[in-house]
């Protein structure tokens, strides 16, 4: 296949700090404990390849519009916590609900999406939890570099 993906395994220092920033700036993306880039992908095996567009957002330039402010107001009763990433039974149940409602292929578990058993996590991974009272209603994972972050699973 033309333009097959290019993968890198983690080195001794993993993909943290400036190393992650450099890969992100070059169009690389995390897949489990590897990092890869590609210019084309397919949605189904044997089907025509389509171009990939890697998007980056300068967070400092984001401005909330009226719709975003209205949504934020409706969500004031929710609690939002940012912490070191961890996969719990509660999170796996939320992922299972998500997986049952999407019409594309997804990993069997949240753990499977984010990790490989062969390596320790080479990223400085964090998570955001959103709760309605004690109930986990949303979660997102991201990796820290030195100056950049990469959203992984939301």
Language-model features: locations:
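A conserved beta-strand-loop-helix scaffold within acyl/acetyltransferase catalytic domains
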Residues: 34-41, 63, 70-154
